[in-house]
Amino acid sequence: MVACSSKKKRVEKVEAPEEPDSTIMVQLQKVTDDSITFLQIDTKRTRTLGYADARRSNSVHGTLAVGDTLAVVPMFKQKLALSVVNVSELTGLWMFEGNSGTGMRLNADGAACDVGPSEVTLREWKLRNGHFILVYVPADGSDYNEKSDTSTIISLDKDHFSYTLNGNEKRCSKVKGLITK
């Protein structure tokens, strides 16, 4: 008697585990030429880290103004900041260059929305391990699955913001007035 088996092995899609996010949110208390002292918002702990290397590698985005909220990627053992982004300057209403009447709003809670017609409908934004990430769906309704784009911050200050979205550079100016901060 001969017996055979045809067991099919189930192939599962294996995804690489996502790198844990080491970004911390802080309130800047003091700044010198090479270090920042801040209050870590979640732990209420005061820390000081060097940021000179981050500045040399263009990983400091925004003005370092006392009292502002920053997103910092720390290396605590080495007492260094790998990346610093001024979240207080990043949030708000941004209008794209070119007088097209289009732009976006980035809220402090991570919500993002478009202003005017756009090729994408923004859902949220986040800073993860020093990267600016926008989550969106195509505006034409062709696909309702959220997509994310790990963008590069080119420059940021209280009035101007340049970044990439899907490899294209976007330049914005901040709008301030009665309904904005």
Residue ranges and their predicted role:
Residues V2-A3:
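C-terminal motif of bacterial Sec signal peptides marking the signal peptidase cleavage site
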Residues S6-M25, V31-L122, I133-K181:
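Lipid interaction determinants
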